[in-house]
Amino acid sequence: MGLIDVLKSFKSPSGREIRILLLGLDNAGKTTILKQLSSEDVQHVTPTKGFNVKTVAAMGDIRLNVWDIGGQRSIRPYWSNYYENIDTLIFVIDSNDKKRFDEMNIELGELLDEEKLRKVPVLIFANKQDLVTAASSEEITRKLNLDLLRDRTWHIQACSALKNEGINDGITWVASNLKPASKK
Protein backbone atom coordinates (compact mmCIF):
# COMPACT_ATOMS: atom_id res chain seq x y z
CA MET A 1 0.00 0.00 0.00
CA GLY A 2 1.46 3.33 -1.05
CA LEU A 3 0.77 6.94 -0.19
CA ILE A 4 -2.03 7.20 -2.76
CA ASP A 5 -3.94 4.30 -1.19
CA VAL A 6 -3.61 5.78 2.30
CA LEU A 7 -4.82 9.17 1.16
CA LYS A 8 -7.76 7.79 -0.79
CA SER A 9 -9.24 6.98 2.60
CA PHE A 10 -8.82 10.62 3.68
CA LYS A 11 -11.81 12.73 2.75
CA SER A 12 -10.76 16.15 1.55
CA PRO A 13 -12.35 18.77 -0.63
CA SER A 14 -11.45 18.24 -4.26
CA GLY A 15 -8.87 20.53 -5.77
CA ARG A 16 -6.77 20.57 -2.62
CA GLU A 17 -3.02 20.63 -2.74
CA ILE A 18 -1.40 19.06 0.31
CA ARG A 19 2.15 20.27 0.82
CA ILE A 20 4.50 18.17 2.94
CA LEU A 21 7.98 19.36 3.91
CA LEU A 22 10.47 16.52 4.49
CA LEU A 23 13.49 17.61 6.56
CA GLY A 24 16.23 16.05 8.67
CA LEU A 25 20.00 15.80 8.88
CA ASP A 26 22.01 14.39 6.00
CA ASN A 27 21.87 10.61 5.60
CA ALA A 28 18.70 10.28 7.71
CA GLY A 29 16.73 8.58 4.91
CA LYS A 30 14.51 11.40 3.62
CA THR A 31 14.94 10.60 -0.07
CA THR A 32 14.44 6.88 0.55
CA ILE A 33 11.16 7.67 2.30
CA LEU A 34 10.12 9.91 -0.61
CA LYS A 35 10.92 7.15 -3.09
CA GLN A 36 8.93 4.62 -1.03
CA LEU A 37 5.96 6.99 -0.95
CA SER A 38 6.02 7.26 -4.74
CA SER A 39 6.67 3.51 -5.20
CA GLU A 40 10.11 4.00 -6.75
CA ASP A 41 13.21 1.80 -6.50
CA VAL A 42 15.22 2.54 -3.35
CA GLN A 43 18.33 0.49 -4.10
CA HIS A 44 20.39 3.36 -5.53
CA VAL A 45 19.59 6.50 -3.55
CA THR A 46 22.15 9.29 -3.57
CA PRO A 47 22.37 12.21 -1.11
CA THR A 48 20.18 15.17 -2.02
CA LYS A 49 22.35 18.19 -2.81
CA GLY A 50 19.43 20.59 -3.10
CA PHE A 51 15.85 19.39 -3.10
CA ASN A 52 13.54 16.80 -4.65
CA VAL A 53 9.86 17.39 -5.23
CA LYS A 54 7.34 14.69 -6.00
CA THR A 55 3.82 15.65 -6.94
CA VAL A 56 1.42 12.76 -6.62
CA ALA A 57 -2.21 12.76 -7.73
CA ALA A 58 -4.05 11.21 -4.83
CA MET A 59 -7.81 11.16 -5.30
CA GLY A 60 -9.84 13.08 -7.83
CA ASP A 61 -7.97 16.34 -8.20
CA ILE A 62 -6.17 16.24 -4.84
CA ARG A 63 -2.45 16.72 -5.30
CA LEU A 64 0.32 15.87 -2.87
CA ASN A 65 3.50 17.88 -3.08
CA VAL A 66 6.29 16.33 -1.02
CA TRP A 67 9.38 18.53 -0.74
CA ASP A 68 12.54 16.64 0.24
CA ILE A 69 15.25 19.16 1.16
CA GLY A 70 18.88 18.14 1.61
CA GLY A 71 20.10 17.90 5.19
CA GLN A 72 23.77 18.82 4.81
CA ARG A 73 24.92 21.59 7.13
CA SER A 74 25.54 23.89 4.13
CA ILE A 75 21.92 23.46 2.92
CA ARG A 76 20.08 23.86 6.25
CA PRO A 77 20.12 27.69 6.19
CA TYR A 78 17.96 27.45 3.06
CA TRP A 79 15.28 25.29 4.71
CA SER A 80 13.39 28.45 5.62
CA ASN A 81 12.75 29.11 1.92
CA TYR A 82 10.26 26.22 1.97
CA TYR A 83 8.18 27.02 5.07
CA GLU A 84 5.33 28.86 3.33
CA ASN A 85 1.97 27.10 3.06
CA ILE A 86 3.13 23.80 4.55
CA ASP A 87 0.39 21.43 5.69
CA THR A 88 2.68 18.98 7.50
CA LEU A 89 6.34 18.86 8.52
CA ILE A 90 8.02 15.46 8.48
CA PHE A 91 11.36 15.36 10.30
CA VAL A 92 13.42 12.23 9.64
CA ILE A 93 15.90 10.98 12.23
CA ASP A 94 18.62 8.39 11.74
CA SER A 95 17.88 6.38 14.88
CA ASN A 96 21.24 4.66 14.62
CA ASP A 97 23.31 7.89 14.58
CA LYS A 98 23.28 8.51 18.33
CA LYS A 99 26.35 10.76 18.17
CA ARG A 100 24.26 13.32 16.30
CA PHE A 101 21.22 13.39 18.60
CA ASP A 102 22.30 16.76 20.03
CA GLU A 103 22.58 18.18 16.50
CA MET A 104 19.17 16.71 15.61
CA ASN A 105 17.70 18.24 18.75
CA ILE A 106 19.05 21.70 17.85
CA GLU A 107 17.75 21.55 14.26
CA LEU A 108 14.34 20.22 15.28
CA GLY A 109 14.11 22.84 18.04
CA GLU A 110 14.79 25.62 15.55
CA LEU A 111 12.08 24.26 13.25
CA LEU A 112 9.58 24.05 16.11
CA ASP A 113 10.36 27.65 17.10
CA GLU A 114 9.81 28.92 13.56
CA GLU A 115 6.73 31.17 13.43
CA LYS A 116 5.70 30.00 9.93
CA LEU A 117 5.60 26.40 11.16
CA ARG A 118 3.99 27.09 14.54
CA LYS A 119 0.60 25.47 13.79
CA VAL A 120 1.88 22.79 11.41
CA PRO A 121 1.55 19.17 12.61
CA VAL A 122 4.91 17.40 12.92
CA LEU A 123 5.60 13.76 12.15
CA ILE A 124 8.98 12.49 13.29
CA PHE A 125 10.12 9.37 11.49
CA ALA A 126 12.56 7.43 13.71
CA ASN A 127 14.20 5.78 10.71
CA LYS A 128 16.60 2.84 10.39
CA GLN A 129 14.79 0.73 12.97
CA ASP A 130 15.93 -2.34 11.00
CA LEU A 131 19.40 -1.85 12.53
CA VAL A 132 19.89 -3.66 15.85
CA THR A 133 21.70 -0.71 17.45
CA ALA A 134 19.03 1.84 16.52
CA ALA A 135 17.49 3.87 19.34
CA SER A 136 13.80 3.15 19.90
CA SER A 137 11.21 5.84 19.29
CA GLU A 138 10.73 6.01 23.08
CA GLU A 139 14.46 6.65 23.61
CA ILE A 140 14.43 9.34 20.92
CA THR A 141 11.38 10.95 22.51
CA ARG A 142 13.34 11.22 25.78
CA LYS A 143 16.61 12.38 24.19
CA LEU A 144 14.88 15.10 22.15
CA ASN A 145 12.51 16.11 25.00
CA LEU A 146 9.52 15.61 22.72
CA ASP A 147 7.20 15.07 25.70
CA LEU A 148 7.66 18.76 26.50
CA LEU A 149 5.88 19.74 23.27
CA ARG A 150 2.49 20.80 24.61
CA ASP A 151 1.46 23.47 22.09
CA ARG A 152 1.72 21.41 18.93
CA THR A 153 0.32 18.30 17.29
CA TRP A 154 3.14 15.79 16.85
CA HIS A 155 3.80 12.09 16.52
CA ILE A 156 6.91 9.92 16.41
CA GLN A 157 6.79 6.87 14.17
CA ALA A 158 9.39 4.10 14.16
CA CYS A 159 10.21 3.10 10.60
CA SER A 160 12.65 1.52 8.22
CA ALA A 161 12.65 3.42 4.93
CA LEU A 162 14.75 0.74 3.26
CA LYS A 163 12.30 -2.02 4.20
CA ASN A 164 9.23 0.23 3.81
CA GLU A 165 8.11 -0.50 7.37
CA GLY A 166 6.20 2.05 9.45
CA ILE A 167 5.98 4.61 6.66
CA ASN A 168 2.32 4.02 5.87
CA ASP A 169 1.49 4.24 9.59
CA GLY A 170 3.15 7.65 9.68
CA ILE A 171 1.37 8.84 6.56
CA THR A 172 -1.94 7.64 7.99
CA TRP A 173 -1.23 9.86 11.02
CA VAL A 174 -0.46 12.76 8.66
CA ALA A 175 -3.74 12.27 6.81
CA SER A 176 -5.74 12.13 10.03
CA ASN A 177 -4.14 15.35 11.31
CA LEU A 178 -4.47 17.54 8.24
CA LYS A 179 -6.39 20.72 8.87
CA PRO A 180 -9.43 21.25 6.65
CA ALA A 181 -8.66 23.31 3.57
CA SER A 182 -9.41 26.97 4.11
CA LYS A 183 -12.15 28.48 1.99
CA LYS A 184 -10.96 31.02 -0.49
Swiss-Prot record:
What CDD domains does this protein's entry cite?
Answer: Arl3 (cd04155)
Give the SMART domains listed for this entry: ARF, RAB, SAR
Q: Name one GO cellular component term.
A: cytoplasm
- Which amino acids does the record list as binding GTP? 24-31, 68-72, 127-130
What keywords does the record list, in alphabetical order? ER-Golgi transport, Golgi apparatus, GTP-binding, Lipoprotein, Myristate, Nucleotide-binding, Protein transport, Transport
Q: Which GO terms describe its molecular function?
A: GTP binding; GTPase activity
Q: One GO biological process from the UniProt record?
A: vesicle-mediated transport
| UniProt-listed Pfam families | Arf
| SUPFAM superfamilies named among the record's database cross-references | P-loop containing nucleoside triphosphate hydrolases (SSF52540)
Give the primary localization class. Answer: Golgi
Q: What is this protein called?
A: ADP-ribosylation factor-like protein 3
Which organism encodes this protein? Caenorhabditis elegans
